[in-house]
Amino acid sequence: MAHKKAGGSTRNGRDSESKRLGVKRFGGESVLAGNIIVRQRGTKFHAGTNVGIGKDHTLFALSEGKVKFEVKGPKNRKFVSIDAE
């Protein structure tokens, strides 16, 4: 008779759900007020003109226009702004 002993246990087998972070509207895209531009942890991107920042550091459009990404300042920070159409 073929028998199989009990298998051992494992301490792995878990993973967290992905948070779907990243850029949601790219440079040159048209946005409406309230549209989410970037979901992020911390300020990888900073809010420029016509862009608001949420409590979880989400950047969103405050007015209608086109998205513009730029690097500026002495620390070469990335800014996201909205150029009004």
UniProtKB/Swiss-Prot annotation:
GO molecular function, one term: structural constituent of ribosome
Keyword Ribosomal protein appears in the UniProt entry: yes
Alphabetical GO biological process terms: translation
Keywords linked to the UniProt accession: Ribonucleoprotein, Ribosomal protein
UniProt KW Kinase keyword: no
Record region (Disordered): 1-22
Gene: rpmA
HAMAP family per UniProt: Ribosomal_bL27
InterPro entries the UniProt entry points to: Ribosomal_bL27, Ribosomal_bL27_CS
UniProt organism field: Aliivibrio salmonicida (strain LFI1238)
One GO term describing the cellular component: cytosolic large ribosomal subunit
PROSITE patterns, alphabetized: RIBOSOMAL_L27 (PS00831)
Descriptive protein name: Large ribosomal subunit protein bL27
A Pfam family hit: Ribosomal_L27
PANTHER family: LARGE RIBOSOMAL SUBUNIT PROTEIN BL27M, RIBOSOMAL PROTEIN L27
Family: Belongs to the bacterial ribosomal protein bL27 family.
Membrane-crossing residue ranges in chain numbering: none
